Amino acid sequence: MTYTYATSGTCAKQIDFELDGNMIKSVVFTGGCHGNLQGISKLVEGMNAEEAIKRLRGICCGSKTTSCPDQLAIALEAALEKQQ
């Protein structure tokens, strides 16, 4: 299933991602640091969403209380809740 998440507090404005059950199939960030976000996307594709959440949740960017990886974790949590 495909999801769209509007981020908050980051340079990236939106995350589009696809889950097959709990498996992350694809992730595309809109805005933000293109190279870094492509890297994050490639690293989590094929990963179990719960494992990605565990690894990414709570990461901060500079003085911000969140980051693009943290926002991805929040988006994945919301998607998993919707699947229940």
Which positions does each model-derived feature cover?
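Active-site- and interface-proximal helix/loop "cap" or "latch" segments in soluble metabolic
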Residues: 6-14, 19, 23-84
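Short, hydrophobic/aromatic-rich segments at coil-to-beta transitions
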Residues: 1-4
